[in-house]
């Protein structure tokens, strides 16, 4: 039987045959002759088409045992014997004791590189577990290597647990499968950190004993020994600090997050020493049989090849040691940034923090740590605050609804309390989902934002009904007060933010063609930002009205005249930023229309679709939203038709109008007190665009056939227009 011979070959080369249990339970039948007989019934070139085997199955089918298609067959192509840990120890191919310091440094650095490659989306079997030492650390007799191997396993285990718990990864981000390997679960976290500390203390003594005394003649050998001990000490301490920081994130107290931040700062201080001593470690020899996977003592890239499913061979390119320190440096900065979230108490500020953090395109581990720090196992924010309380605080800050004011008669009304409590409870899940969405990678975020609009549309409907019910109750108790569109305004604000983010992220992900820019920028400037401005103004007015009522109540109680102080409006900066964004979008819309008039926008020859099909596809997720109502293509064409103006504007007029919009955005942003990085980024686009638009309005390069260039390097949503 063909299968039998391949099994024997496999057992000889790999020691991984069919498990005994499977052999005993299965009733193996040889179908070779029966299959060949059935094949004879087919004519030459004829294929059997089963209804369960369609085009999709054909495209994803794997021809097993073909080296080009089956990852498990790569092992048969190498001309060396692939050994597992036990075999390698038995054959003395690797040592478990009496390792030199350069060997330890080389093994540790390669292990760090494998750890990073795993965090970047490759499988454990092709990265960390290519290091034979982590297969069974109990057999290692060298204390430094044993403690390090256990430390790496614990780091992997906690990272895997955190990423799984946060659930903000997709198949392209992370592979959590452990392939049956033990993750040092027989040893406690405390024991491993203790072992690393013991090794660290021993190495520190060696570092001190080999240190040069002042004015002493230095022996080159002693100096080299000192540098090597220091290099090993830095790596062991770094492993302990990284592990201790991850352990801190598993605790429920917020003080543990502050502790993790301190540990990360200490770890960052060790990185220069690690980087400076990379050359002291033994260097890997490139695997000449397959790419450039590092082959060195203790590592076998093909040891787990048969554990991989029969898929197209995926080669894991292990990062270089020089890049390792840079990656760890950025990871530490991201984790330190994650720790800052516990200092934020306002829900809107937390949402902004998640958005800003996500814009850096952070790794899956730091994204997951942020999620699990925000919402701990007990479903409380930072383990202490109820999400419902945070939503109520956000409502008070944004729109000051009378029902949440302690000085309002509704505050003691049981029916009103039931209305608002029920509404806030219904808000909890969509807002938790919205925060979780910002933990996904940027491409997946966009897709999920489109889907969550449906939940917010339902909330919008409920908010309007609750507002109406509360207004009815309030009119009976306090006729001078209103409760119109308070909750509705707040939900509408979040609805608009999601819609704006959905459209803008398309520029970042490079989803739009140049000929589509004009209707995307039109929708943003004329519609979404116009609605957002109106919503923010309404929220600001609502706040002011509530403040006036409270001031009048205080005047009645106190006969003293209070000094009037000009109070800073909480929403003023957001209103200014929204105006600036609206002007930038309007400027880009008019620029695109003018460029199209001058025949400087390349348009496709539509065959299977049309502009209407593309337009409807781009705005399809907005169809589930009632407020604001979606603008359909025919409406858009009517609203943006230039022929309704008399006389219709020429391209020069539109360039000049675009220049004025960019100028207005510049003026608004230059008046922002303490401008942040985003303000400066927009100014970098607005200033050159003002100049370019004025040049184009004056007829500059009008006759040139060259198409304009859109440079998104300064800002990911608004390009600098370049005329070549």
Swiss-Prot record:
Keywords: Cytoplasm, Developmental protein. One of its GO terms (biological process) is somitogenesis. Pfam families: Mak10. The keyword Cytoplasm applies. InterPro entries: Naa35/Mak10. It is found in: Cytoplasm. GO terms for cellular component: cytoplasm; NatC complex. The keyword Oxidoreductase does not apply. Its main location: cytoplasm. It comes from the Eukaryota. Component of the N-terminal acetyltransferase C (NatC) complex. Belongs to the MAK10 family. Auxillary component of the N-terminal acetyltransferase C (NatC) complex which catalyzes acetylation of N-terminal methionine residues. N-terminal acetylation protects proteins from ubiquitination and degradation by the N-end rule pathway. Regulates cell proliferation during embryonic development. This is N-alpha-acetyltransferase 35, NatC auxiliary subunit. It comes from Danio rerio.
């Amino acid at each position: 039987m063909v299968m039998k011979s391949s099994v024997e070959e496999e057992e000889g080369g790999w020691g991984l045959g069919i498990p005994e249990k499977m052999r005993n339970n299965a009733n193996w039948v040889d179908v070779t002759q029966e299959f060949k007989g059935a094949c004879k019934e087919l004519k030459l070139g004829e294929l059997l088409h089963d209804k369960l085997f369609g085009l999709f199955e054909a495209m994803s089918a794997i021809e097993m045992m073909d080296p080009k298609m089956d990852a498990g067959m790569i092992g048969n192509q190498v001309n060396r014997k692939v050994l597992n840990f036990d075999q390698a120890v038995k054959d003395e191919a690797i040592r478990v004791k009496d390792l030199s310091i350069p060997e330890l440094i080389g093994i540790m650095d390669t292990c760090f590189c494998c750890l990073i490659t795993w965090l970047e989306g490759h499988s454990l079997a092709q990265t960390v577990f290519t290091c034979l030492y982590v297969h069974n650390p109990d057999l290692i007799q060298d204390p430094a290597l044993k403690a390090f191997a256990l430390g790496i396993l614990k780091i992997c285990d906690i990272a895997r647990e955190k990423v799984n718990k946060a659930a903000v990864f997709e198949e392209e981000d992370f592979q959590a499968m452990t392939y049956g390997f033990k993750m040092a679960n027989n040893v406690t976290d405390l024991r491993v950190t203790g072992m690393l500390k013991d090794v660290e203390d021993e190495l520190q003594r060696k570092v001190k004993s080999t240190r040069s005394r002042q004015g002493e003649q230095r022996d080159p050998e002693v100096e080299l020994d000192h540098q090597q001990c220091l290099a090993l000490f830095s790596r062991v301490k770094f492993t302990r600090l990284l592990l201790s920081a991850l352990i801190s994130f598993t605790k429920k107290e917020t003080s543990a997050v502050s502790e993790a931040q301190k540990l990360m700062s200490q770890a960052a201080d060790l990185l220069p020493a690690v980087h400076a001593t990379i050359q002291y470690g033994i260097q890997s020899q490139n695997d000449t049989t397959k790419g450039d996977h590092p082959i060195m003592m203790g590592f076998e890239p093909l040891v787990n090849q048969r554990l991989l499913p029969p898929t197209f061979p995926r080669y894991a390119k292990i990062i270089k040691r020089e890049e390792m320190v840079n990656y760890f440096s950025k990871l530490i900065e991201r984790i330190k940034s994650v720790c800052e979230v516990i200092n934020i108490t306002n829900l809107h500020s937390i949402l902004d923090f998640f958005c800003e953090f996500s814009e850096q395109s952070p790794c899956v581990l730091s994204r997951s740590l942020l999620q699990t720090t925000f919402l701990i196992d007990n479903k409380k924010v930072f383990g202490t605050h109820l999400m419902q309380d945070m939503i109520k605080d956000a409502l008070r800050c944004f729109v000051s609804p009378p029902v949440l004011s302690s000085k309002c008669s509704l505050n003691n009304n049981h029916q009103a309390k039931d209305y608002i409590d029920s509404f806030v409870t219904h808000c909890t899940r969509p807002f938790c989902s919205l925060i979780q969405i910002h933990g996904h990678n940027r491409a997946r975020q966009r897709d999920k934002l489109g889907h969550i609009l449906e939940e917010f549309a339902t909330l919008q409907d409920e908010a309007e009904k609750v507002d109406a019910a509360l207004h009815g109750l309030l009119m009976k108790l306090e006729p001078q007060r209103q409760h119109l569109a308070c909750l509705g305004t707040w939900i509408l604000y979040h609805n608009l933010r999601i819609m704006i983010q959905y459209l803008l992220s398309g520029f970042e992900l490079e989803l739009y063609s140049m000929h589509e820019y004009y209707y995307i920028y039109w929708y943003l400037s004329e519609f979404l930002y116009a609605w957002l401005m109106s919503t923010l103004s309404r929220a600001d007015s609502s706040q002011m009205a509530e403040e006036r009522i409270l001031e009048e109540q205080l005047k009645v109680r106190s006969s003293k005249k209070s000094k009037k102080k000009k109070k800073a409006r909480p929403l003023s900066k957001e209103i200014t930023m929204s105006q600036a964004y609206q002007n930038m979008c309007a400027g880009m819309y008019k620029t695109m229309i003018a460029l199209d008039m001058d025949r400087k926008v390349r348009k496709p020859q539509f065959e299977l679709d049309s502009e209407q099909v593309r337009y409807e596809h781009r705005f399809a997720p907005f169809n589930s939203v009632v407020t604001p109502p979606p603008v359909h293509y025919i409406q858009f064409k009517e609203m943006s038709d230039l022929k309704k103006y008399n006389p219709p504007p020429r391209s020069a007029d539109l360039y000049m109008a675009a220049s004025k919009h960019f100028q207005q955005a510049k003026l608004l942003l230059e008046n922002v007190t303490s401008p942040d990085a985003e303000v400066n980024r927009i100014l970098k686009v607005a200033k050159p665009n003002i100049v370019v638009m004025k040049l184009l309005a004056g007829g500059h390069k009008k006759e040139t056939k060259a198409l304009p260039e859109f440079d998104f390097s300064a800002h990911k949503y608004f390009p600098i227009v370049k005329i070549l």
